[in-house]
Amino acid sequence: MTSIDDAPQRSAAHDAVAEVLRGHIRDIPDWPQPGVVFKDITPLLATPTAFGVVIGALADAARALGATTIAGIEARGFLLAAPVADRLGTGLVPIRKQGKLPGPTRSASYDLEYGAATIEIHADAVHDGDRVLLVDDVLATGGTAAAAHSLLAAGGGEVVGLAVLMELSFLPGRDRVAPLDVVSLLTI
């Protein structure tokens, strides 16, 4: 598994991407609940040059992994996956919360700290031979990413990796999505 931020031989380009992220992610303490520090990416989204650098790095990761399809997890994953797919000329698979997609769907459920959640894709979104890169903003506990991985694989796609802006290394996300390759532009 890979993390650009903590790879043994980081390149200057990787360091530059991590620095761009550090300069464009805002900490919001005690949101959405006391004790949580929310990582707000809206400053990144509001800065076209910084956003372009990050999308370029994610697109480079997709190319390196041989992705032929990009899948984005609702909601902030959509903001990253769509421009990556556009830049690469690939299709985009939106992974939505249950009940948000019309027509036949495939679903996968996963446990949350208190309760459960379900995500869905269109039944025909992934095909045999598709090499899918899963894209999201943050890898934390890994529950959503693991469910998305199983959902895409059940549809016939080969999930070639998970690419995220940032990984919260103090949480078990990387272990939960193993053996997927994880490309993290910034490890916190």
From Swiss-Prot:
Keyword Oxidoreductase: no
UniProt GO BP: adenine salvage; AMP salvage; purine ribonucleoside salvage
Enzyme class: transferase
Chief localization: cytoplasm
Pfam family, one: Pribosyltran
Assembly with partners or alone: Homodimer.
PANTHER family registered for this protein in UniProt: ADENINE PHOSPHORIBOSYLTRANSFERASE
Name of the featured protein: Adenine phosphoribosyltransferase
